[in-house]
Amino acid sequence: IASGAQAPGISRLLLDDQSLDSGWVGVRICNTPLRTIVSQGCRPIGDPMVITQAERNIIQQLGGRRAFDILSELFQTLPTREQRIFQSGLQIGRVINEYQDSFQYGDFLIRNITGVDKGLGSISIGDYVRPGQTIQFHIRDHESASAEFSQLVKTGAADSIPKAALLFTCNGRGLNL
């Protein structure tokens, strides 16, 4: 499947040594173990925090304080370069497995921040949350995406040498990844 084109004929389909601008190309994988890796392209900023008040997809409090206040304070502590990334690539990572002592790449399910309400001090995200869950703010940039992808590939290659790969990308992870 080739998607994302603005008009028919723009996507390129590859079949053996041919490059096509229409039609379809299929891949059949049989009797081969598959391993999926996902580079979310985000790196954590600040510290992990526990949601203390939330309703549906709206985080009202983190650690007993207004979520927006914590977000504003975090912004002030960042270097200028990271503040620029923060303004266009801020995400929230929700911990997948709470039963760990510390968290690292792959331990978070990354979600978009869909809005903030400065008056109420709340943050809305693209997922339902509940009190007691651990979150951490993340920023998305191409350097993080590339580093995380390289680490995941190295970890996977230690088990066996890959014979092939399928790569799916998006602009949020960086145009050059």
Feature map (PLM): residue ranges:
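Small-residue-enriched flexible segments
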Residues: I1-N176
